[in-house]
């Protein structure tokens, strides 16, 4: 796993083999951030990374200048890894919550420019995530919600759906209120 761009461009992050995660591939992550480059200015934004896993997406946003990154991960080993890696990178702007995403979303914590979610592909209630995000106060009015998912799911009929991109087995659906 490597950081694609920004202050820590090219930095390799070695993850322990015992983490129960499927990190977003470098190819898919680079493609995602190429799209985001045309949608947002990374400087001084707030980002919420749900189902953060290894923190791969959180580190990329930090490297590109995000002011605040909140990582939510239920697995203790993963949350500890994100905290340790953030300390090593001196990423004081990354805050880690060891919590279920569904529990976290019930308690207003902040207001974000981008919310990224990479749930397990077999998550039973993945279809409910866009509605949970848009019914909460977490996303700014002009903010973006990006959901990584398998090809089994289509969100094109959701009222805030904006676009879909596919990179190998990785699918990203983009949502925005405006």
Regions from the PLM with identified roles:
Residues 1-178:
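Class I S-adenosyl-L-methionine-dependent methyltransferase catalytic core
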């Amino acid at each position: 796993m490597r950081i694609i761009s920004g202050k820590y461009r090219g930095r390799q992050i070695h993850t322990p083999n015992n983490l129960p995660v499927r990190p977003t591939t470098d190819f898919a992550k680079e493609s995602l951030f190429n799209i985001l480059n045309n949608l947002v200015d990374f400087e001084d934004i707030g980002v919420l990374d749900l189902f953060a896993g290894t923190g791969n997406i959180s580190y990329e946003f930090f490297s590109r200048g995000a002011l605040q990154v909140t990582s939510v991960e239920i697995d203790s080993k993963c949350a500890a890894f994100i905290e340790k890696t953030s300390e090593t990178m001196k990423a004081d702007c990354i805050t880690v919550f060891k919590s279920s995403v569904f529990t976290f979303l019930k308690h207003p914590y902040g207001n974000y420019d981008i919310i990224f979610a990479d749930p397990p592909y077999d998550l039973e209630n993945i279809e409910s995530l866009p509605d949970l995000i848009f019914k909460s106060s977490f996303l700014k009015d002009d903010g973006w919600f990006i959901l990584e998912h398998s090809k089994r799911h289509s969100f094109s009929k959701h009222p805030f759906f904006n676009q879909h991109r596919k990179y190998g087995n990785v699918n990203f659906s983009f949502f925005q209120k405006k």
